[in-house]
């Protein structure tokens, strides 16, 4: 997202900041110094747009004052933008020792013995039928549950083409088809077809995320009523839900579906990196 702001204020010709932005007849903007680099029309003094070839005469070229002002604002805010839109390493001191709650796992999810990895399978695991279990959707919850404090965990989605991670309310529906949306108690980011990313807002929010996203960092701050998602590989911010309700416990949420019959991709909870993090004084309730 920080890179997106930089692209907005760059001249497409010299790639420098558009501090003296001008606009052609068609709306194309570049810096004043780069006007001379534009091709002239064959039989006149008009300038050809690099993208659409619309001719702009001298009177058509106008200063773009709003863009100039935006450049100034973004440059002034850039240090703050970097701190807000990048992952803070100090989040890891709130990393929690998390496992999957088998009692909630769909029967077609094959969960590892250490309760930290799972994949989708063809055969039912014949676990006990109970109300806590997702009986249709390929989902599982994590433990512990959270009612207060700050908590951080990382999920390795590997080569999975279809997945969703985040949190959900303790009371979410687990029977039959579920709707992953904030209205129904799910605060998640997810992927479809390995390249389409979205947050579970209403309506859905498309996300600009690297297709190479393999590890997602999740930071839940119950006191601040927010949950933020990061690309751990480059530290880039993915999305933040704000003003989240705090009327009941939040549960870590995981969903996974095979992209094809041969897909053996695995979704995993990453191990605690800081050895002292598991015993850090975070406020949560165990299962």
UniProtKB/Swiss-Prot annotation:
One of its GO terms (molecular function) is zinc ion binding. It is found in: Cytoplasm; Nucleus. Gene3D superfamilies: 2.60.120.920, Zinc/RING finger domain, C3HC4 (zinc finger) (3.30.40.10). It holds the Pfam family RDM. PANTHER family: E3 UBIQUITIN-PROTEIN LIGASE TRIM. Keywords: Cytoplasm, Metal-binding, Nucleus, Zinc, Zinc-finger. It comes from the Eukaryota. Interacts with PSMB1, UBE2A and CCNB1. Residues 78-276 form the B30.2/SPRY domain. This is Ret finger protein-like 4A. It comes from Homo sapiens (Human). InterPro entries: B30.2/SPRY (IPR001870), B30.2/SPRY_sf (IPR043136), Butyrophylin_SPRY (IPR003879), ConA-like_dom_sf (IPR013320), PRY (IPR006574), RDM_domain_RFPL (IPR022723), SPRY/PRY_RFPL (IPR037960), SPRY_dom (IPR003877). A zinc finger (RING-type) spans 11-53. GO terms for biological process: innate immune response; regulation of gene expression. The keyword Zinc-finger applies. One of its GO terms (cellular component) is nucleus.
């Amino acid at each position: 997202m920080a890179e997106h702001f930089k692209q907005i204020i760059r001249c497409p010709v010299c790639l420098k900041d558009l501090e003296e932005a001008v606009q052609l007849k068609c709306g194309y903007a570049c810096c004043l110094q780069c006007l001379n680099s534009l091709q002239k029309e064959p039989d006149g003094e008009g300038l050809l747009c690099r993208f659409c070839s619309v001719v702009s005469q001298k009177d058509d070229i106008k200063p773009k004052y709003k863009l100039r002002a935006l450049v100034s604002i973004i440059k002034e805010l850039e240090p703050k933008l970097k701190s807000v839109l990048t992952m803070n390493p100090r989040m890891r001191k709130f990393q929690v020792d998390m496992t999957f709650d088998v009692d909630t796992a769909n029967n077609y999810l094959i969960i590892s013995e250490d309760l930290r990895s799972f994949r989708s399978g063809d055969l039912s695991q014949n676990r006990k039928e109970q109300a806590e279990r997702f009986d249709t959707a390929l989902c599982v919850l994590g433990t512990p549950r959270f009612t207060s404090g700050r908590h951080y965990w990382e999920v390795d989605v590997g080569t999975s083409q279809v997945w969703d991670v985040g949190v959900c309310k303790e009371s979410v529906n687990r029977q039959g088809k579920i709707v992953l949306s904030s209205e129904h108690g799910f605060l998640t980011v997810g992927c479809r077809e390995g390249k389409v990313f979205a947050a579970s807002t209403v309506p859905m929010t498309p996300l600009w995320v690297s297709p190479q996203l393999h590890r997602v960092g999740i930071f839940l701050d119950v006191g601040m009523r927010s949950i933020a998602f990061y690309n751990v590989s480059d530290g880039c911010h993915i999305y933040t839900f704000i003003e989240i309700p705090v009327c009941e416990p939040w549960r870590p949420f995981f969903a996974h579906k095979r992209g094809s019959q041969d897909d053996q991709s695995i979704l995993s909870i990453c191990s605690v990196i800081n050895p002292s993090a598991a015993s850090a004084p975070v406020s949560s309730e165990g299962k």
